[in-house]
C-alpha cells in the first residue's frame, strides 16, 4: 500500500522556523505544510493590502522560503501553505523571486484565489453567527470577508505540477488533506476517506502542539527537551491509515495523550466537525501507541459536505487604550491596589468615555479575578494594568496617559510604565452559499 509522509512546518504565523528545516532535512517527507493563518490574521493582512497592493501576505514568508526552498527542491518535497493570507498572487510572485535568487529556476508555483468574497457579502443580509446582526450593519467598519476553501483547488494545483501551493483562507485540515487527495486520487465524495484525512489534518495543523508543546505541564505532564521541540509528521496510507510521529532525536514527544488532547482542540461537536470538504466524525476515533513517538490513529469517518461555506468576517470593532506600571518591594501589593483606585477615580473625574474598563494586577488577579486569588501569598512585585474599550482613538489614548501620570503623582516607586492605543480588528462568521465562492488556480514560474 502506498504511503506518504506530510510534515507540519508551522502552527501559526510567528512559529519557529528551524523545526521545518529539520523536517525537510531528516523527516523523509514528501510534503511540507505551513499553516500560518489565524482567524484575525487575514483581516489584518487585508488592511496591509489596502495600503500597498503588493503586501498582505505573511510577514515571515521570505524567511521561511529562504530556509527551506533549496532543501525541498533538492529532495522533491512539495510545499503547501496559507501564507498567501490576503494576497496569494503577490505571495506566489514573491516566492518566485526568492526561488530565482537561490538559483532555483524550474520551480512551479501556484496561487489559489477565490476565498475573498467581500463583494458577495458586503451588500447582503447574511446573519452573523456570534451576535444578533447582519454583515450589512457593519457598514464601513467591514474590512474583509474570506470563505474557508477546501482541499480541492489545492489538490488541483498539485496535480497541475505545482511544487509550491500558496493559498489564502482555507480550512486548516484542508492544507493537509489536499496532498492526500492528489497522491491517492481520493474522490471528493468518498466521505469516510475525507473524514479520516480530516482527522489527520486536524492533528497536524498546530505543529508543535501535538509533539508536546501545548501539552507540557511540569510535574503533571513532563515533556523533555522543549527548546528543541520537533514538529510532527503524518504517515498516511491510501486507505486513510495514519501514524503520527516526529524526527528521531528531536525534542518533545508523540504519545496517545498528546494526540488525544490535540484531537479535541477547538472541537465543539466531535460527531460533526464541519469542514468545506466533509462533515467529519471524530466520535469513533481510536488512538494507540505502537512504538516510541509513533501513534496509530484510526476510525475517522465523514458524511456529505454542507451547502454553505463558513466566511470569516473582519471588521473594526472599537479601540483599546492601555497603561501599565510596576511596583516592587515591601508593600508592593498595597501600592498597586492604590494605583488602580487612583486611575479609576481619575477616569471618572476627567470624563473618559469608555464602554468597558479593566483594572488588574498582573500576577495577582489578571487572569482568574480577585475572588480566586484572594488567599494567595502576597507577591514581592506586581504590575498594574488598566485597559478600556472606547469608540474613538482619542479616548483610548487618555486611558494610557492616566496610568503614566502615576510616575510622579503617586503612589511611590512606580517604574517601567507602558501605554498604547490601537484599533480592535474583530472577527465574526457568516454562512455563504457554496456556489458564491469560486476558487481558481494561477501558476507562476520561478
Identify the residue ranges that each predicted region occupies.
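Gly-rich Lys/Arg/Thr-decorated short loops/hinges at beta-loop-alpha junctions or inter-strand turns
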Residues: 1-2, 39-55, 73, 117-141
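A conserved active-site cap/scaffold subdomain adjacent to cofactor or substrate pockets
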Residues: 194-299
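N-terminal glycine-rich anion-binding loops that anchor highly charged ligand groups
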Residues: 27-45, 70
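Catalytic or ion-translocation cores adjacent to nucleophile or general acid/base/metal-coordination motifs
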Residues: 100-117, 177-218
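Active-site glycine-rich loop that binds ribose-phosphate moieties when present
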Residues: 144-158
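C-terminal non-catalytic interaction/assembly regions of soluble proteins
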Residues: 299-446
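Flexible, glycine/charged-enriched surface loops at secondary-structure junctions
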Residues: 105-109, 210-222, 270-289, 346-362, ...
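N-terminal amphipathic/basic leader segments beginning at the initiator methionine
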Residues: 1-22
Amino acid at each position: 500500500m502506498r504511503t506518504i509522509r506530510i510534515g507540519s512546518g508551522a502552527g501559526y504565523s510567528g512559529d519557529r522556523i528551524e523545526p521545518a528545516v529539520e523536517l525537510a532535512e531528516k523527516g523523509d517527507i514528501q510534503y511540507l505544510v505551513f499553516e500560518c493563518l489565524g482567524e484575525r490574521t487575514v483581516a489584518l493582512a487585508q488592511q496591509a493590502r489596502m495600503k500597498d497592493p503588493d503586501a498582505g501576505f505573511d510577514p515571515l514568508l521570505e524567511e521561511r522560503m529562504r530556509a527551506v526552498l533549496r532543501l525541498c527542491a533538492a529532495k522533491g518535497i512539495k510545499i503547501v501553505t496559507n501564507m498567501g493570507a490576503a494576497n496569494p498572487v503577490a505571495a506566489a510572485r514573491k516566492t518566485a523571486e526568492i526561488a530565482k535568487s537561490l538559483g532555483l529556476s524550474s520551480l512551479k508555483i501556484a496561487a489559489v484565489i477565490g476565498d475573498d468574497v467581500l463583494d458577495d457579502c458586503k451588500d447582503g443580509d447574511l446573519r452573523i453567527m456570534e451576535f444578533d446582526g447582519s454583515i450589512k450593519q457593519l457598514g464601513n467598519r467591514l474590512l474583509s470577508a474570506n470563505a474557508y476553501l477546501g482541499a480541492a483547488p489545492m489538490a488541483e494545483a498539485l496535480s497541475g505540477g505545482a511544487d509550491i501551493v500558496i493559498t489564502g483562507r482555507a480550512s486548516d485540515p484542508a492544507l493537509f488533506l489536499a496532498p492526500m487527495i492528489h497522491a491517492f486520487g481520493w474522490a471528493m465524495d468518498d466521505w469516510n476517506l475525507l473524514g479520516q484525512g480530516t482527522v489527520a489534518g486536524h492533528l497536524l495543523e498546530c505543529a508543535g502542539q501535538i509533539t508536546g508543546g501545548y501539552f507540557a505541564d511540569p510535574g503533571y505532564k513532563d515533556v523533555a527537551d522543549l527548546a528543541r521541540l520537533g514538529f510532527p509528521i503524518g504517515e498516511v496510507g491510501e486507505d486513510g491509515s495514519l501514524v503520527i510521529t516526529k524526527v528521531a532525536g528531536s525534542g518533545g514527544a508523540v504519545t496517545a495523550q498528546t494526540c488525544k488532547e490535540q484531537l479535541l482542540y477547538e472541537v465543539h461537536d466531535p460527531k460533526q466537525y464541519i469542514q468545506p470538504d466533509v462533515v467529519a466524525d471524530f466520535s469513533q476515533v481510536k488512538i494507540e501507541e505502537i512504538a516510541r513517538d509513533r501513534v496509530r490513529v484510526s476510525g475517522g469517518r465523514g458524511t456529505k459536505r454542507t451547502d454553505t461555506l463558513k466566511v470569516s468576517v473582519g471588521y473594526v470593532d472599537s479601540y483599546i487604550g492601555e497603561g501599565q506600571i510596576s511596583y516592587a518591594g515591601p508593600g508592593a501589593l498595597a501600592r498597586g491596589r492604590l494605583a488602580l483606585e487612583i486611575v479609576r477615580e481619575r477616569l471618572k473625574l476627567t470624563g473618559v468615555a469608555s464602554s468597558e474598563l479593566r483594572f488588574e494586577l498582573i500576577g495577582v488577579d489578571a487572569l482568574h479575578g480577585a475572588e480566586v486569588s484572594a488567599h494567595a501569598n502576597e507577591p514581592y512585585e506586581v504590575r498594574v494594568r488598566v485597559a478600556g474599550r472606547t469608540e474613538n482613538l482619542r479616548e483610548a489614548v487618555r486611558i494610557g496617559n492616566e496610568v503614566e501620570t502615576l510616575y510622579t503623582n503617586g503612589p511611590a516607586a512606580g517604574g517601567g510604565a507602558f501605554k498604547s492605543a490601537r484599533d480592535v480588528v474583530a472577527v465574526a462568521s457568516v454562512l455563504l452559499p457554496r456556489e458564491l465562492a469560486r476558487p481558481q488556480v494561477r501558476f507562476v514560474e520561478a
